[in-house]
């Protein structure tokens, strides 16, 4: 099965050469997702909860556009700028993954825009269209 590019309506145009997501062999790969509006401006500066919610809602749109749900997520890579935001980010994260949690890692690092507090990249196994 060839790779399918996933670009949900209203998604910001990436500031680098990549797409929001790809689907191949029933697996959705969601690019690192930052708290950007459609013009690539950081939303909710200084608010880790609101930024995390925005990022996860964007990820959900990519996965749903590909035909999946957040329950299909199997792995998240989380990048945060400050450990002091870890609890706040986890609080919102838990709302999006109330049942069985996906595997993940979280590291502290700098992000592409200093106002961004969190970035998440995701893998979701949605199966093949029409079954399997």
Swiss-Prot record:
One of its GO terms (biological process) is uracil catabolic process. It catalyses: (Z)-3-aminoacrylate + H2O + H(+) = 3-oxopropanoate + NH4(+). It is an enzyme of class 3 (hydrolase). SUPFAM superfamilies: YjgF-like (SSF55298). One of its GO terms (molecular function) is deaminase activity. It comes from the Bacteria. The keyword Hydrolase applies. Its EC number is 3.5.-.-. Involved in pyrimidine catabolism. Catalyzes the deamination of 3-aminoacrylate to malonic semialdehyde, a reaction that can also occur spontaneously. RutC may facilitate the reaction and modulate the metabolic fitness, rather than catalyzing essential functions. This is 3-aminoacrylate deaminase RutC. It comes from Cronobacter sakazakii (strain ATCC BAA-894) (Enterobacter sakazakii).
């Amino acid at each position: 099965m060839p790779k399918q590019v996933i670009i949900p309506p209203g998604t910001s145009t990436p500031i680098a050469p990549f797409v929001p997501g790809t689907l191949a062999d029933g697996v959705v790969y969601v690019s690192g997702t930052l708290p950007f509006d459609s013009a690539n401006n950081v939303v909710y500066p200084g608010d880790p909860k609101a930024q995390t919610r925005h990022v996860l809602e964007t990820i959900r749109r990519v996965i749903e556009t590909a035909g999946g749900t957040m329950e299909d997520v199997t792995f998240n890579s989380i990048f945060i700028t400050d450990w002091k935001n870890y609890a706040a980010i986890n609080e919102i994260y838990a709302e999006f993954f109330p049942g069985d949690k996906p595997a993940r890692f979280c590291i502290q690092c700098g992000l592409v825009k200093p106002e961004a507090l969190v970035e998440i990249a995701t893998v979701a196994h949605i199966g093949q269209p029409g079954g399997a």
